[in-house]
């Protein structure tokens, strides 16, 4: 994975961390256009992570642990039954953050790649 610039990573993490409040605003009918877009981006990015885990049940459990680790700022060591090693866990987390940043058009375009990759 390509390392994200600190500012891009911080903004993408903030988008993920705000997702629980965003869900409440959507549920209460008080959501902005950004709320709707960001909630969809976070959901799609999360579902796209951990693609190398074959079991759908295990993949969803891992995705939930990654999501909670970012939303509640919990390190790997505080997550019970992480289902993988520390390094793999943080690679999945980085993948999730990068997918959010990419979907929000926060990443610089790479030479030789089309927009949106």
Give each language-model segment a name.
Residues 54-74:
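Short amphipathic alpha helix immediately N-terminal
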Residues 89-107:
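DNA major-groove recognition helices of helix-turn-helix
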Residues 72-85:
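Helix-turn-helix DNA-binding module
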Residues 7, 11, 61-65, 92:
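Residue-level detector of well-ordered alpha-helical segments, enriched
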Residues 36, 40, 60-64, 94:
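Non-catalytic, well-ordered alpha-helical scaffold segments
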């Amino acid at each position: 994975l390509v390392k994200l610039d600190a500012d891009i990573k911080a903004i993408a993490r903030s988008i993920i961390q705000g997702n629980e409040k965003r869900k409440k605003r959507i549920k209460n009918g008080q959501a902005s256009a950004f709320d709707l877009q960001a909630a969809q981006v976070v959901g799609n990015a999360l579902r796209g992570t951990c693609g190398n885990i074959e079991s759908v049940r295990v993949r969803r459990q891992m995705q939930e642990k990654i999501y909670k680790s970012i939303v509640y700022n919990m390190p790997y060591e505080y997550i019970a039954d992480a289902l993988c090693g520390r390094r793999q866990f943080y690679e999945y987390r980085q993948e999730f953050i990068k997918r959010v940043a990419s979907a929000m058009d926060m990443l610089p375009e790479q030479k030789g790649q089309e927009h949106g990759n």
